[in-house]
Amino acid sequence: MRKFTAFACGTGAGLAAFYLQRLRDPKQTAWVHNSWTNSERPVDSWALWDSNWDCRDPKSLVRPQKNEQPQEQNRYNSDFEKNHAKSARHIILIRHGEYLDVGDTDDTHHLTERGREQAKFTGQRLHDLGIKWDKVIASTMVRAQETADIILNEIDYDKAKVTNCAYLREGAPIPPQPPVGHWKPEASQFFRDGARIEAAFRRYFHRAYPDQTKESYTLIVGHGNVIRYFVCRALQFPPEAWLRISINHASITWLTISPSGNVSIKYLGDSGFMPVKHLTNRIPRDAKNVV
């Protein structure tokens, strides 16, 4: 009888606590229910995909129909087709190889021997993928330039056609969440670098132009912070989350922008094609002026 009484009391207390919680916070119960069982109704409005994130959704570029007359419908449909993307864009992002942070200027920040080998492995990997490149773009910083040069020795692309872009230089894109104690740039650096890196994102990340008739492949050689920020922005994740991601030196990140504007990620920091001894993501311990 004592065991039965204890069991009944325990069950009753549990049920009472459950219903009391429901009475106190019914919204929280609905939140849990929706988050696990109803994918069509996101809990947070931030989870909704913005289909016009690049301001190139044809619906936003075409003058709306004035009426339902056939002539007006034909005009709208014709304008819509002229502004509608028809092919996908593949953007492949490569982080530079390992380098030494020696000296106070970028001119002295050269790749280590291992960094050069990493870049060669990446170039060979890209060659093996058999991609026909439409564009190759590189940050103007020395370590990215050296990485791009080594990669270009391995792939089929004319070095004279490479675009060098200062917008892609390394920097502090946005204050990260959660904050970290070992890396705290001044607010002025975020103010300066953030606008530039966001401008780079808007320059290179968008759906294909309407006159593009086949899938395109763009190779961008850049930096860890910039690439991680690009990934968060492209996938419409909170951009403040960029520092939660880690990518290795000379790794491959592959994003695809479909004609509809949807974005998917194929690789994130892929470096599995390298020997284990070549897997690095930080400046070597023997570097000077480590930041």
From Swiss-Prot:
The chain crosses the membrane at residues 7-23. Keywords: Hydrolase, Membrane, Mitochondrion, Mitochondrion outer membrane, Transmembrane, Transmembrane helix. Residues 59-78 are annotated as: Disordered. This is Serine/threonine-protein phosphatase Pgam5, mitochondrial. It catalyses: O-phospho-L-seryl-[protein] + H2O = L-seryl-[protein] + phosphate; O-phospho-L-threonyl-[protein] + H2O = L-threonyl-[protein] + phosphate. Interacts with Pk92B/ASK1. The keyword Nucleotide-binding does not apply. Residues 67-77 have a biased composition (Polar residues). The gene is Pgam5. Its EC number is 3.1.3.16. GO terms for molecular function: phosphoprotein phosphatase activity; protein serine/threonine phosphatase activity. GO terms for biological process: positive regulation of mitochondrial fission; protein dephosphorylation.
